[in-house]
Amino acid sequence: MSTERSSVSVPSNWREDNRAMWDERVPVHVAGEFYDLDGFRARRDVLRDFETAEVGDVTGRTLLHLQCHIGTDTLSWLHRGAARVVGLDFSAPAVEAARALAAGLGHGPERAAFVTSDVYDAAEAVPEASYDIVYTGLGALCWLPDIRRWAETAASLVAPGGFLYLAEFHPLTEALDDATGSRIVHDYFRRGAQVWDEPGTYADPDAPTVHNRSVEWQHTLGDVVSALAAAGLRIEFLHEHDVSLFPRFENFVVQDGYHRFPAGHPRIPLIYSLKAAKG
């Protein structure tokens, strides 16, 4: 069972705690059924239908994936026609796993490159100055204390005429009870660092783990949109979706490959997605 402690300040070792937690979980994710890398090698695409519809045709375009983990989404865009993809993650084991996956599929670094770096240092770490598409999300932003700095970094990497695409779990869900998602039990506007101590991983809750401390932050929808606008990007759309990728609430059912509320339950947004263009 997880425990949470909120703090008004940023714990000095937040990055080290989070990196140790993610580093330890990479082998579990590589070997487990959740990411199903053998299945990925066969089907070569794990992107969600709303993402591919909203991003559109990527043929011949360059794409940077911030906080890419083990690279399955990154490589899916390559398989959909991107000319070159670059994935960035702060976990060295995750990047090594992504490189191995790419190499096993026959992709050299000229087509699929993976870089180890903190996302705030991405502009100095990635091989190109800018990309046609900067892609991120689905569990990425909660690990970052400064959303404005993230937006400035991401915007700086979007090529003129290009865009940032973000799909992320809706922050409203973090204000609701875990059982049914029907009651407001947490402050939507809470700002402090949230410190968790939780063994296992979303991919395997029973996996034995040692590095279980992590630090997260909640960013409201207004925070994210405003940060991107302040960074000079033009918001082209903001969409909300009534599906999730995991059983966020205990009463969820699986339908059409997504987790969602059962029939008759009032719906709320579970994921949001946005496109923000430069120029």
What are these regions (language model features)?
Residues F163-Y202:
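Conserved class I S-adenosyl-L-methionine
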Residues E33-T62, S76:
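Conserved alpha-helix/loop element of class I SAM-dependent methyltransferases that forms part
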